[in-house]
Amino acid sequence: MKEFNWNEFKKEKIAVHCNTMQGTKDFINKCYENNIDWCDASKSETLSFLCKHYNSNRYFDFDCHSLEWDEKSFYSDRGYKIIEWD
């Protein structure tokens, strides 16, 4: 993604969807560059998990000062704006 508003992602109800594993890796690495870490795991553990269990139905959000994921229905039911990363 060429332009992404990281401040808006951190402050608003936004979920990000990645269509590919490469897009997922890119998004997560950009999160790290913007000081966004996972809520419950180390960086290496999380990337390893995502590589082994890739799911194109996974959406990411920033909540309670950390990165989390869930299914699309979780976010759409709660009124999140969904942005396509790749």
Functional labels for PLM-detected ranges:
Residues M1-D86:
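Structural boundary micro-motifs
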